UniProtKB/Swiss-Prot annotation:
It catalyses: tRNA(Phe) + L-phenylalanine + ATP = L-phenylalanyl-tRNA(Phe) + AMP + diphosphate + H(+). HAMAP family: Phe_tRNA_synth_beta1 (MF_00283). This is Phenylalanine--tRNA ligase beta subunit. The lineage of its organism: Bacteria, Pseudomonadati, Chlamydiota, Chlamydiia, Chlamydiales. The gene is pheT. Binds 2 magnesium ions per tetramer. The keyword Transferase does not apply. Belongs to the phenylalanyl-tRNA synthetase beta subunit family. Type 1 subfamily. Its cofactor is Mg(2+). It is found in: Cytoplasm. Residues 404-483 form the B5 domain. Its EC number is 6.1.1.20. Its main location: cytoplasm.
Length: 790
């Protein structure tokens, strides 16, 4: 946003220096810089005030001036006829280089003129490179009375401007008034409204309209103005618009643009001849409509789009742009001027649909001040009346009423302490927020805050904490080192370091997938693409990683060992969810450099990586159950799902051959994807501790049993471990057999039970007795194993 300093200064009760304005912008959170750059030699030409003058004792045409340059008083010998006490002039300090009357560059030095010391020079505009600003007889340039002292004179002469980059939450600063209001809160000045925007109310008439959409446009004003003609706006208005970055067009359009850029309220003028019954309102489109806008482009407005219309025709897309058919033109003698409050979401949705970005849409989509609609309309009407004295103004037509109460929030000292480590009482918090335009009531343990209607960015307690943060000097802020990361961040950092140290490369792929990459997945997504785009949010890390792996392999990478940590999105029961996942992808054959043997990738390769990952995360593999899964992206017989009770942690296995073919990868790919949110919830908080090596021997016994072929052998192993036994140390699966002498619906599994006592050596009789007890319990419970597990 281009912001001319002279225009901005008019909104301050006392002028601020450019440095003070830039410092205030930094505290607001606005990236701002001065757009005019001059040679260093001219940076020492500053504004100064002539305090007194007296005739030179030895020169009739010279005077001795005492000038204050913002820092100190200095004596300057001046020959300009207009040098007098009280004026503010450009003062070239020693070291500055200016052009003299002959056009030669002269360096200003401390010198003596006719016996008196001169510590600088009072300059004319032409001597600083601005001859077009020099008026009348040759003399020194005079600045306005409220010009701050010590400022760069060249910046002021050039009409210095700020280039401001506004973040989306600073929509209330997208005008001279809004920016000046925020700067005044954070500096030693107060906000004042220039006379050109201070007008008394005008007559109004309220009326209703059955088709007006009060939800999307709570209040809508329109006024008929006749007796107009086509003409250009005055030079000073054109100059102001140019300084604001707008091209002057004609008087009416220039006024609406100037009011919008100054006060933040978009306005639009319609040719009255194009408006049926001279009445406007905001309504929604019931079916798709074609509309040609002012830019001569034709757009298809979707059903539900908010538009400005009369009784029969659509005259513009509300908050974005008017139609070409209703545009103000050279033949227009009567207009209907519209000013309204449109809800940000009502404008944002359909403005994005047609991909049209305008100055009006920029402000409406971020939220305007609903209390500023009528004052902006008054300002435009009075400016039009000043340019067209014969114009006739009809009473303002009003539809609706903005009745929304200000948002009320509570801010607690303990929240401030937790987030900023600032210890403030409720009364101190209220003192910090009140100067920012908030209405505050300090209570016993909190502060009740009413948010101004123009602050659409303040929605919760943490937003108020941010307001206090930006008004607190750095020297008062905490010396305590706050936690640098959250538990989920610590887990991500730990796992990424572990996997990188294990030889895997980290991938970073985009959360938005185009149709080509999204099509790599065989799973149907529950998310729909972004409007007017083939992009959609990913529901898995797989597609992006596959695309990256294929790119690396096509560039002759011998293999791809990679992992990624990122967000995935899903929709369940009309609720959108965002989770953080971690994925591992391994493809192509792996070469063991020590033996030069190629080891094929398999289901068990990725299973071992999952086990190592869980172990490093501080989660025991014993806490999980492996179950068969039917995920469409995996080989139907080489995949598994990992569950903790009924909670799914993730899936892993060999990818489906068809998926590899679609990705143009000729080798097997194994893949695992786990939920970091679930993993964090299961992470044990105990610190690692030392377990001594056993000094007494163990003894093992094997057992072979027949179970249902669909029952996982691991469930039987876990069942044995669940029995209370002070000697059973571990249970291992030795073999699983299906074939001869075993029915087609059954399988044999062999388990090895390891017994040990850490205080003595067990006897064979003790082991046999414990073995018999455990196998008897297993026989009794065998029928119930697997029931209730999912």
């Amino acid at each position: 946003m281009l912001t001319p300093i002279p225009l901005l200064q008019r909104f301050f009760s006392s002028p601020l220096s450019i440095k003070e304005i830039l410092q205030a912008c930094d505290r607001i959170g606005i990236e701002a810089e001065c757009s005019n750059v001059f040679p260093d030699s001219l940076n020492t030409v500053v504004t100064g005030k002539v305090l007194s003058t007296s005739p030179h004792p030895d020169a009739e045409r010279l005077s001795v001036a005492i000038v204050f340059d913002g820092k100190e008083e200095r004596q300057i010998i001046c020959g300009a006829p207009n040098c007098r006490a009280g004026i503010i002039v450009p003062v070239a300090l020693p070291g500055a280089k200016i052009r003299n009357a002959l056009g030669e560059v002269t360096t200003i030095k401390k010198s003596k003129i006719r016996g008196l010391e001169s510590l600088g020079m009072c300059c004319g505009a032409d001597e600083l490179g601005f001859p077009h600003l020099q008026t009348g007889e040759r003399g020194i340039f005079e600045f306005p009375e409220n010009t701050p002292l010590g400022e760069s004179a060249c910046l002021l002469l050039a009409g210095a401007s700020l280039e401001c980059s506004l973040t989306p939450n600073l929509g209330h600063c997208a005008s001279l008034l809004g920016l000046a209001r925020e700067i005044s809160f954070l500096s030693d000045t107060s906000l004042t409204i220039p006379e050109e925007f201070s007008f008394s109310p005008l007559p109004q008439e309220s009326h209703s309209c059955d088709t007006h959409n009060l939800e999307a446009s709570p209040v809508f004003y329109s006024v008929k103005i006749s007796g107009l003609s086509w003409k250009q706006s005055p030079e000073d208005l054109q100059a102001s618009l140019i300084a604001l970055g707008q091209k002057p067009l004609n008087a009416i359009v220039d006024i609406t643009n100037y009011v919008m850029l100054s006060l933040g309220q978009p306005l639009h003028a319609y040719d009255s001849q194009a408006v049926d019954q001279k009445s406007l309102h905001a309504t929604t489109v019931r079916s798709p409509q074609q509309l040609t806008l002012l830019n001569k482009e034709t757009y298809t407005l979707p059903e539900g789009a908010l538009v400005v219309a009369d009784q029969h025709n659509i005259l513009g897309l509300a908050g974005v742009m008017g139609s070409a058919a209703s545009a103000y033109s050279e033949s227009t003698t009567e207009i209907i001027l519209e000013a309204a409050y449109f809800l940000p979401q009502a404008v944002r949705k359909y403005q994005r649909t047609i991909q049209l970005h305008t100055e009006a849409a920029y402000r409406f989509t971020r939220g305007i001040d609903p209390q500023g609609v009528l004052p902006a309309l008054y300002a435009a009407i009075h400016m039009i009346r000043a340019l067209f004295p014969e114009a006739q103004i009809s009473p303002i037509q009003k539809i609706g009423e903005y009745k929304s109460d200000p948002l009320s929030l509570n801010i607690r000292p303990k929240t401030l302490k937790r987030l900023l480590d600032l210890s403030l009482s409720p009364s101190e918090i209220a003192e910090k927020l009140s100067p920012l335009g908030f209405q505050t009531i300090a209570e016993e343990s909190s502060v009740r805050v009413e948010v101004p209607l123009y602050r659409h960015d303040i929605q919760e307690e943490t937003d108020l904490v941010e307001e206090i943060c930006r008004t607190t000097p750095f020297v008062q802020k905490t010396q305590k080192i706050l936690p640098t990361y959250t538990p989920i961040y610590a887990l991500k950092r730990s796992l990424s370091t572990f996997l990188a140290d294990s030889g895997l490369q980290q991938f970073f792929t985009c959360s938005l997938l185009d149709s080509e990459i999204a099509a790599l997945s065989l799973q149907e997504s529950s998310l729909i693409p972004v409007q007017n785009s083939s992009l959609k949010l990913r529901d898995s890390l797989l597609s992006g990683m596959l695309k990256s792996a294929a790119t690396n392999l096509n560039r002759q990478a011998p293999y791809v060992y990679a992992f990624e940590i990122g967000n995935v999105y899903s929709k369940e029961h009309n609720q959108y969810r965002e989770e953080e996942h971690i994925a591992i992808l391994l493809t192509r054959q792996v070469m063991d450099d020590s033996w030069h043997v190629k080891t094929p990738l398999s289901f068990y390769t990725i299973k071992s990586w999952v086990e190592k990952l869980l172990c490093h995360a501080g989660v025991s593999i014993e806490d999980f159950v492996l179950q068969a899964s039917q995920h469409p992206n995996f080989h139907p017989y080489r995949q598994a799902a990992l569950y903790h009770k009924k909670q799914l942690l993730g899936v892993f296995g060999t990818l489906h051959p068809q998926l590899c073919k679609k990705s143009q990868i000729k080798h097997d790919v194994v893949f695992a994807e786990l939920s970091l949110n679930v993993l964090l919830s299961l992470k044990k908080k105990t610190e690692p501790h030392y377990v001594p090596y056993p000094i007494y021997p163990s003894s093992s016994r094997d057992i072979t049993i027949t179970i249902d072929k669909d029952l996982p052998a691991d469930l039987v192993r876990r069942e044995l471990l669940s029995f209370e036994s002070k000697w059973l140390e571990s249970v291992h699966i030795v073999s699983v057999y299906q074939g001869k002498d075993v029915t087609s619906q059954s399988k044999n599994i062999s388990l090895r039970l390891v017994f040990r006592d850490h205080e003595r050596t067990l006897s064979g009789q003790e082991i046999e007795k414990e073995y018999e007890r455990l196998t008897t319990l297993l026989d009794k419970n065998l029928a119930n194993i697997g029931k209730g597990n999912s």
